[in-house]
Amino acid sequence: MAMLVTNLSSSSFCFFSSPHLQNQKEIRSGVRVRKYVIFNRASLRTVSDCVDSITTFDRSVTDANTQLRRFCESGNLENAVKLLCVSGKWDIDPRTLCSVLQLCADSKSLKDGKEVDNFIRGNGFVIDSNLGSKLSLMYTNCGDLKEASRVFDEVKIEKALFWNILMNELAKSGDFSGSIGLFKKMMSSGVEMDSYTFSCVSKSFSSLRSVHGGEQLHGFILKSGFGERNSVGNSLVAFYLKNQRVDSARKVFDEMTERDVISWNSIINGYVSNGLAEKGLSVFVQMLVSGIEIDLATIVSVFAGCADSRLISLGRAVHSIGVKACFSREDRFCNTLLDMYSKCGDLDSAKAVFREMSDRSVVSYTSMIAGYAREGLAGEAVKLFEEMEEEGISPDVYTVTAVLNCCARYRLLDEGKRVHEWIKENDLGFDIFVSNALMDMYAKCGSMQEAELVFSEMRVKDIISWNTIIGGYSKNCYANEALSLFNLLLEEKRFSPDERTVACVLPACASLSAFDKGREIHGYIMRNGYFSDRHVANSLVDMYAKCGALLLAHMLFDDIASKDLVSWTVMIAGYGMHGFGKEAIALFNQMRQAGIEADEISFVSLLYACSHSGLVDEGWRFFNIMRHECKIEPTVEHYACIVDMLARTGDLIKAYRFIENMPIPPDATIWGALLCGCRIHHDVKLAEKVAEKVFELEPENTGYYVLMANIYAEAEKWEQVKRLRKRIGQRGLRKNPGCSWIEIKGRVNIFVAGDSSNPETENIEAFLRKVRARMIEEGYSPLTKYALIDAEEMEKEEALCGHSEKLAMALGIISSGHGKIIRVTKNLRVCGDCHEMAKFMSKLTRREIVLRDSNRFHQFKDGHCSCRGFW
């Protein structure tokens, strides 16, 4: 009391001067004192003042409530909560509690909010709709959505606003199912909904990709009479577009009685995002005609549409509109404009926009780097990346992946390594997107050791990481490593191989002729429904064709619902490899009748088929069709096919003259095709002339030296063989050893000439001796010229018995059941003696043998070969 008297005697309480002291009774009763003590803001600044005042005089409900509201109005949450906690239940009005809860919600103070909630529940307050609404709002704003939902379970909240807020916050936190569940509860509670309710819940259906749920919501909206509301219509348009239901979105848009700029922007952006840029741009034109004022979002979407459809003229017109509308200083405008020009191939305009930007961001640099990369200016892209730090702009993940993709595309290994060093220095190496891009760069540059190192150091891997490393090994001819990693992926069971994985590993099966493994993967594809992916289907057809199962390949080809050019080309190439030129031509004609235009690659496959089937006239005809009807300029590959075709059929001089008259300089591939023809037809003199041209073009290619040495050996010109082998040694070159492999019970067995490492060596040698004896009985004489050694005939015969393809075929026959097809692959051209023995083996054992060499397939059956001598 003494402290209070002291306070009252201070200058701030001058109302106690004599003019005011008229009624001592009123003063004693404390009515006026209480009134001025509670209401004077200047004096009572702390909760302790309020508590002293309230406890000193007769308390009334109005006292605490009024001061609490004062605290709430001034934002003094700390004192409001303290005062509330020392107040009794009967002092506080529920409306005051609502004010305090609102302050907690606005301040996002969960701790204070929980204290208020405890006060409410501890004092037995009835939580009605109003108080429950504020409680749920407090918990929602403070991020405790679980408690907010609990309040909704306990109390019937009647105002849609609070339902909408919680629904929206649940969706923002990623709990889309919870948001939809709250909407369903709102329906069952009979709460009157508003437009915002439907906008909130449609976003959740959209995020869950729940098309069926969204369609049901659409029906409910129409029944509820909200279908004509602009905001609801915009939400439905956005829902359908996000779920790729473009036609449904357009229908909603067309039925909207009132459209705003958001409506138009949504449908334009939706078309562009779903790969229908031209339709989006058409809507933009309608928007202009309708007199709707465009905004920055409109222009950004239109730039993206122009970029996708390469409509640079429209892009320039919109550029002018944007400048007039004063958008040219907006980052989004400049960045999308720059991207549009670079994607349309107008790099000069893109550079002009880039130079004029006053505030270049990392997005600007990334767009410019991607533009340089698209135009093949890889050096400029890398240079710009290196300049970024000089300008004080740190590249982000997107910039780094863009420049790595550029290095990968143009095989810039040294530049890629420099970027890798920068990544290490800036601790970006553990980002999964960067690591995947690094692996891809190294793999495409043929540096699989570095790619494997990046893969092994990754802390977190995803399926893209596995696909990149498996695909890298497969494309760089490390088929065994690709299959091993694929098996490891299956064993780990952390990720399931997807469409991309199987498309990456199937070429490895094809390379090894691993028919059984390929068939296992085929089963996996069918079980998981991946065959509908055209890339997978094409890879599967290619795998079976390269494993010698041409009939199965064609059956799968027929099953492809929508064949593209790759599908047809793969099958044509398959027939060509097997020597079925007429079938390849028939398929090519079928393709053209189906309205699919041939390209350079499909013509290479067709000309190859003609070459390996001896169809010279047809080969010339299609070569001319390609040039004159299809307007395709022949490349080195096309000319090489024609030279090979002429050389195989023995027209070596014509082939030589054809090369001399070519409009482009011949490379080693073309001269090499003629050199192979010289070997087939034993023309040593022309071979010497051709070989010098090949050696000049590719002096480090051992294969051509070996080919010429073999030509000399077959002609028994041993001195020339010695000189050539000495030349190889002087250059420090190494001969690529011939090897063959065969898959037995899921294991690939590899043989080199004279190999005795296989556990079945004794049985293999015994079988080959038996076959050779039977062949000699039937009048066969070993073709010892293919032994390629200067020795006695007996030694030559023994050398022939040790050829790798013979060893592989023998293992296949003695290790597999009767009737099983033998599939062997050799890295070099099969020799003539092995070819003859394979024919005899197929007849003797009544087994089909499929031998794939570096040139083509040989299918041996009943003593005959499918090549018919064209090999």
From Swiss-Prot:
Task: Tell me where the PPR repeats sit in this chain.
Answer: 60-94, 96-127, 128-158, 159-193, 194-228, 229-259, 260-294, 295-329, 330-360, 361-395, 396-430, 431-465, 466-497, 498-532, 533-563, 564-598, 599-629, 635-665
Q: What tissues has this protein been observed in?
A: Weakly expressed in leaves.
**Cofactors demanded by this protein:** Zn(2+)
Chief localisation class: plastid
Q: Keywords in UniProt for this one?
A: Chloroplast, Metal-binding, mRNA processing, Plastid, Repeat, RNA-binding, Transit peptide, Zinc
- Extract the ranges annotated as region (Type E(+) motif): 746-776
Protein origin, superkingdom: Eukaryota
Subcellular localization: Plastid, Chloroplast
Q: Name one Pfam family in it.
A: PPR
Q: Give positions of region: Type E motif.
A: 670-745
Quote the cofactor binding remark. Binds 2 zinc ions per subunit.
GO CC annotations on file = chloroplast
Xref: InterPro entries = DYW_dom, E_motif, Pentatricopeptide_rpt, PPR_At4g14850-like_plant, TPR-like_helical_dom_sf
Q: Region Type DYW motif: which residues? A: 777-871
Q: Where is the transit peptide?
A: 1-28
Q: Please provide the Gene Ontology terms (biological process) for this protein.
A: chloroplast RNA modification; cotyledon vascular tissue pattern formation; leaf development; leaf vascular tissue pattern formation; mRNA processing; phloem or xylem histogenesis
Keyword check for Metal-binding: yes
Q: What happens when the gene is disrupted?
A: Defects in venation pattern in leaves and cotyledons.
- Protein family per UniProt: Belongs to the PPR family. PCMP-H subfamily.
Q: Give the NCBIfam families listed for this entry.
A: PPR (TIGR00756)
Q: What is known about what this protein does?
A: Plays a major role in single RNA editing events in chloroplasts. Acts as a site-recognition transacting factor involved in the edition of the unique site (corresponding to cytidine-488) of rpoC1, which is a plastid-encoded subunit of the chloroplast DNA-directed RNA polymerase. May provide the catalytic activity for editing site conversion. Involved in leaf vasculature patterning.
This chain's protein is named: Pentatricopeptide repeat-containing protein DOT4, chloroplastic
